[in-house]
UniProtKB/Swiss-Prot annotation:
One of its GO terms (molecular function) is structural constituent of ribosome. The lineage of its organism: Bacteria, Pseudomonadati, Pseudomonadota, Gammaproteobacteria, Enterobacterales. InterPro entries: Ribosomal_bL35, Ribosomal_bL35-like, Ribosomal_bL35_CS, Ribosomal_bL35_sf. One of its GO terms (cellular component) is cytosolic large ribosomal subunit. Keywords: Ribonucleoprotein, Ribosomal protein. The keyword Nucleotide-binding does not apply. Pfam families: Ribosomal_L35p (PF01632). This is Large ribosomal subunit protein bL35. One of its GO terms (biological process) is translation. Signal peptide: none annotated. It comes from the Bacteria. It comes from Pectobacterium atrosepticum (strain SCRI 1043 / ATCC BAA-672). Belongs to the bacterial ribosomal protein bL35 family.
């Protein structure tokens, strides 16, 4: 049986944690930052976790993670 291919875009976006979850970066912190408040930008800075509803999709994209 052939190997399952990893979705390369997902491999670059998600990192697996020791507990089995996946870390991800928050959106809306790339450009057009002048109109966003400092508080909003600060809260977007730390890594987020993939929600339970999306976890199955991420696991399917990363079969060897």
């Amino acid at each position: 049986m052939p190997k399952i291919k990893t979705v390369r875009g997902a491999a670059k976006r998600f990192k697996k944690t020791a507990g089995g979850g996946f870390k991800r970066k928050h959106a809306n912190l790339r450009h057009i930052l002048t109109k966003k408040s400092t508080k909003r930008k600060r809260h977007l800075r730390p890594k987020g976790m993939v929600s339970k509803g999306d976890l199955g999709l991420v696991i399917a994209c990363l079969p060897y993670a």
